[in-house]
C-alpha cells in the first residue's frame, strides 16, 4: 500500500505536465517528504454518455485535457454518485450517506454542525494544507444565506446556489463579497483557481467545482469549443451541440488550469475528476434516455465518470470496483495524512492506485422527490431500487441498462439469494 501519511516511498509516473499531448513520458520523482497537492475537479451534470472511454452514447465531445487524465491515469467504471448535485457534494464533503446529513435533494442545507473534509484536513499535524473551493457550492440552500467559509474553508470564490441564469452575466461571491461579473463563468473560475494555486507556498487542496455543462444552454466563446458557429439557443433548437460546446469549453479551461501548475508542483499533485450526477434528460443519450438520466436512481443518473491521475497513481487503465461518493472523502483524507479516513461511511480506496483488490461488496445511493424517499443498492451483479410503493430488481451483468425488471416474485435461486442479500444490506445501512 502507498504510504501517503509518511511520504517515504518514491513513486514512478507516466504523465508529464498533464498536457493535451498523447506522447507518454515519466515524471521525475518528487520530494518524498512533501505532502501531495490534491486537485478535485467536479463537472456539473456530466454523464458517461458524453465522456470518452465509456461505451455509452454515440456523440462524444473533443476533450483532450480530460482524455489525458484518463489515458495516463486510472478510469473507474463503477463510481456511484447521487442523482442530483447537492447530495453528491454533501457526501463528498462529510463522508456520510445523504440521509445522515439530510441533504437529499437540490437546495437542502448542510448543517454547519457537520464536520467537513476541509476541517479534518486542517487538523492534520504538520502538513499545513491550504484549502479552497472555487466554483459551484450549493450546500447552503437556495437563498445563499450561509457563507461557505463557515464550513471550514480557507477560501471560497464562485456561486453559492445551484447555478447561473446566464454564463455571461452572473454574481460572483468571493469570501462573502458579492460582485457582478460579465465574463464567461467557466473562464473566470479557472482564472481564480490559477491565481489561488500560484499564491500557495504550502501543500494545497483545491475543490474545483465547475457549473458547466449545467443549463442554461448557451454558446461558449468560439475558441473554446469545436461545435462551429452556433446561433443563440432557443427551445426550437437541438440542445445537444450546446451541451457539447459547454463540455468542450470546460475541458479547454481544465487544460489551462493543469498546464498553469508549476513543474515543481505538478510532480507532486494528484488529480481527481468526477461528474456529480448523470446527464440531464433533455440531452441524455442511448442507452439511458430521458427516463433513466439525471434525477433518477437508474445507472444513467448515478453511475458517472471518474478518473484519477498524477502523484501516486501507479496503476493505469480501468478499474471495475464499486466506489461510493463518500469513498472519495476517505481517500482524500488518507492521502492528506489523516488517521480518521475510515471514521464515516466512506472507505478509502487508496490501495487501488497501486493494486487491484475488492474494495467494497456493496454500493449505495438515494434520493428524495418531494417527501418521498427512494434508495438503491448493488453488489455489482444485481441492483435493487426501493421506491415508496414498489421495488425494482435488475441483473446488471446481463441487463446493464435496466430494461428488464425481474420483480421480486418468480425468481430463480441465484436471484432470490442476491435479492435477500441486498435487502439485508440496505437495512443495515439505514
Name these PLM-found stretches.
Residues 396:
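Carbohydrate-binding surface patches
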Residues 22:
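Short, conserved catalytic or interaction motifs in soluble domains
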Residues 18-19:
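C-terminal motif of bacterial Sec signal peptides marking the signal peptidase cleavage site
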Residues 25-387, 391, 400-424, 428:
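Formylglycine-dependent sulfatase
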Residues 2-4, 26-27:
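Short, aromatic- and cysteine-enriched interfacial helices/patches
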Residues 4-12:
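Sec-dependent signal peptide recognition
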Amino acid at each position: 500500500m502507498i504510504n501517503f501519511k509518511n511520504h517515504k516511498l518514491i513513486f514512478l509516473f507516466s504523465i508529464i505536465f498533464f498536457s493535451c499531448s498523447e506522447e507518454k513520458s515519466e515524471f521525475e520523482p518528487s520530494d518524498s517528504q512533501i505532502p501531495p497537492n490534491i486537485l478535485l475537479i467536479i463537472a456539473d451534470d456530466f454523464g458517461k454518455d458524453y465522456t470518452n472511454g465509456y461505451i455509452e452514447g454515440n456523440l462524444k465531445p473533443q476533450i483532450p485535457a480530460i482524455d489525458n487524465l484518463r489515458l495516463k491515469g486510472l478510469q473507474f467504471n463503477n463510481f456511484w454518485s447521487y442523482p442530483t448535485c447537492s447530495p453528491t457534494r454533501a457526501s463528498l464533503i462529510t463522508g456520510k450517506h445523504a440521509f445522515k446529513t439530510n441533504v437529499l435533494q437540490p437546495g437542502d442545507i448542510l448543517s454547519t454542525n457537520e464536520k467537513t473534509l476541509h476541517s479534518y484536513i486542517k487538523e492534520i499535524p504538520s502538513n499545513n494544507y491550504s484549502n479552497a473551493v472555487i466554483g459551484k457550492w450549493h450546500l447552503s440552500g437556495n437563498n445563499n444565506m450561509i457563507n461557505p467559509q463557515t464550513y471550514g474553508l480557507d477560501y471560497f470564490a464562485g456561486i453559492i446556489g445551484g447555478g447561473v441564469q446566464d454564463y455571461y452575466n452572473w454574481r460572483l461571491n468571493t469570501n462573502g463579497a458579492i460582485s457582478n461579473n460579465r465574463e464567461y463563468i467557466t473562464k473566470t473560475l479557472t482564472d481564480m483557481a490559477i491565481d489561488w494555486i500560484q499564491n500557495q507556498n504550502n501543500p494545497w487542496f483545491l475543490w474545483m467545482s465547475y457549473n458547466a455543462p449545467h443549463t442554461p444552454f448557451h454558446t461558449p466563446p468560439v475558441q473554446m469549443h469545436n461545435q462551429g458557429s452556433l446561433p443563440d439557443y432557443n427551445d426550437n433548437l437541438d440542445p445537444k451541440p450546446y451541451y457539447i460546446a459547454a463540455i468542450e469549453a470546460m475541458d479547454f479551461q481544465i487544460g489551462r488550469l493543469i498546464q498553469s501548475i508549476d513543474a515543481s508542483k505538478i510532480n507532486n499533485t494528484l488529480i481527481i475528476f468526477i461528474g456529480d450526477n448523470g446527464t440531464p434528460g433533455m440531452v441524455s443519450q442511448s442507452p439511458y434516455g430521458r427516463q433513466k438520466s439525471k434525477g433518477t436512481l437508474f445507472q444513467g443518473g448515478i453511475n458517472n465518470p471518474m478518473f484519477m491521475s498524477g502523484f501516486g497513481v501507479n496503476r493505469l487503465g480501468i478499474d471495475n470496483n464499486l466506489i461510493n461518493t463518500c469513498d472519495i472523502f476517505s481517500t482524500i483524507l488518507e492521502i492528506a495524512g489523516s488517521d480518521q479516513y475510515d471514521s464515516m461511511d466512506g472507505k478509502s480506496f487508496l490501495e487501488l492506485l497501486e493494486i487491484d483488490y475488492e474494495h467494497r461488496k456493496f454500493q449505495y445511493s438515494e434520493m428524495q422527490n418531494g417527501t418521498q424517499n427512494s434508495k438503491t443498492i448493488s453488489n455489482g451483479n444485481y441492483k435493487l431500487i426501493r421506491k415508496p410503493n414498489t421495488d425494482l430488481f435488475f441483473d446488471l451483468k446481463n441487463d446493464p441498462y435496466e430494461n428488464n425488471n425481474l420483480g421480486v416474485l418468480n425468481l430463480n435461486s441465484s436471484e432470490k439469494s442476491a435479492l435477500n442479500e441486498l435487502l439485508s444490506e440496505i437495512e443495515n445501512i439505514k
